[in-house]
Amino acid sequence: MDRKDFIKQMRSWQNGSITRREFLGRTGLGLAAAVVATQMPGLLTSKAYGADKAIGDRVVLATWPNYHNAENFAAFAEKTGAHVQMNVFGSNEEMLAKLQAGGSGWDLFVPTNYTISTYVELGLIEPLDLARLPNFDAASYEKRFMEQGIVDGKLYAVPKNWGTTGFVYDSDKIKSKPTSWKEFWELAKGDASGRVMVHDYQLTAIGNALKSFGYSFNSLDPKELADAEKLLLEVKPHLFAINSDYQPSMRNGDAWMSMCWTGDGSQLHRDLPNMQFTLGKEGGELWSDFFAIPKGAERPDAAYALINFLLDPQVNKLEVEAHGYPSGDKRVDALLPKAMLDDPIMYPAAELLSALEFGAAATLTSPERAELMARFKAA
């Protein structure tokens, strides 16, 4: 397989068209590393990230769909001998339940901002040793995208990426140019019946139903939740699927519209210009994701090495270019092409961002929201 074919397979994995297993089977990480070493030798000479000592043959990362650059993982494996094994999840509730159950096997994971205080309260994550993360520079990050990684004066998580939650639609199929969550739900019940996807994630599924009524994305008010539930139950028979990995169905035409995170919107629009990403005019979610290490992780040296490697600005630039999520690191922004910095999907106008809300910690463990989501999925 030549480099062109390898890159094609890598893109297919990144956009969700093939699984990680299929990617490895078709290419092999050895070949991947060879390509990276030849084409991007700078990746293999980053500031100390664990290459000076043995860190084992693998590192287990729990993360989200379509959220990493396979070439960077190959470069990391080539330099350290540790291959990255991914466990992919579609919600923070899933991640929390897995850690609470014990035996996750994770060495690091990617929680969202509003969940970190809960992980700390439950004793599920360790404070980070910044001496082992020389590529992390707190001064390079905007405060709002990193402050929730700090609990009681201790740093428990460092920023990975930030983004928004909107919806994506196929403009060849949906001609009305929707701009609101109200229109999203109306289309789901009407002209796009059978072709719409909703996240398998209570924060966004319930939150964006709430927004269509003008309520807070994080509402726990019983009446407001009842209104959201009524809407969700009305829509449920019309949905194509409830799934947080929606790129494959949007790409193959089974779905015409889906709740969508920034990077998925960027990837879809980049490859298929008819895919349009929209932030509902009522508002919605602004979020930031972090790297954290679970308490008792089996391979902490490998976890620190991988985090530090990915925080290298040159490496992080390649991450952003591949997945389309802003890093929040000014050093990385300075390396990105102007076309990306001007992309309104990645960097929405200030007035659009001002209408968005960060998720609230109380929603993660709210029994009312959990039960509502369970009824919605079971209907």
What would you call each of these model-derived segments?
Residues 126-137, 157, 273-285, 294-297:
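Short beta-strand->loop
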Residues 49-118:
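Early extracytoplasmic/lumenal segment of secretory-pathway proteins
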